[in-house]
């Protein structure tokens, strides 16, 4: 059973999903890949994980970095999970390029245990920034797993499932212009 709840953010409606214990999805209403973890049987219910997630979002949209993370369970391929773990290391107010994530994955592949370990057999020297972009784009828990902090080469604001304007607004919230 999948449970859902809604959150009204300053940037628009957000849908939350849970398996009853952990957050499994967080999407801006209407974004690309919206509801990718939702099955046919969804029930609206106010669970403790939703209360905690709404508290996290309240702090975040107030312009502060939350000091806790709600419990999350993300379903995906080993490669996607490795990319999503790297996303979680991007600091509040910071950014990382798709190419930098690809390089980090290569380090994990060739150095043994690490974020990319086990995602693909054997060491690799190259990783496609496009492959990384595909995994970033399928991140089921927007904002908390900060895919909006991933930018193109040279800092261009590309490839956010909720659209470039929301990406710009989220980055501006974290790093306001002087």
Q: Could you describe each region identified by the protein language model?
A:
Residues 3-10, 64-178:
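Nucleic acid-binding interface residues in structured DNA/RNA-binding domains
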Residues 1-24:
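DNA-contacting interfaces and partner/effector-binding or oligomerization modules
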Residues 12, 28-31, 75:
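Histidine- and/or cysteine-centered catalytic micro-motif in compact active-site loops
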Residues 18-69:
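Compact structured core domains
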């Amino acid at each position: 059973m999948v449970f859902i709840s809604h959150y009204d953010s300053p940037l628009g409606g957000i849908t939350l999903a849970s398996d009853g214990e952990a957050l499994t999805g967080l999407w801006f209403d209407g974004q690309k890949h919206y509801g990718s973890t939702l099955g046919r049987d969804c029930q609206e219910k106010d669970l403790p994980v939703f209360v905690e997630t709404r508290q996290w979002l309240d702090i975040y949209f107030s312009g502060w970095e939350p000091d806790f993370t709600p419990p999350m369970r993300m379903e995906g391929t080993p490669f996607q999970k490795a990319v999503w773990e790297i996303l979680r290391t991007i600091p509040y107010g910071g950014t990382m390029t798709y190419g930098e994530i690809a390089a980090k994955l290569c380090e994990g592949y060739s150095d043994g245990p690490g974020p990319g370990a086990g995602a693909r057999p054997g060491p690799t020297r190259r990783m496609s920034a496009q492959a990384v972009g595909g995994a970033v784009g399928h991140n089921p828990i927007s904002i908390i797993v900060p895919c909006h902090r991933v930018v193109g080469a040279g800092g261009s604001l590309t490839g956010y499932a909720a659209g470039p304007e929301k990406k710009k607004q989220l980055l501006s919230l974290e790093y306001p212009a002087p």
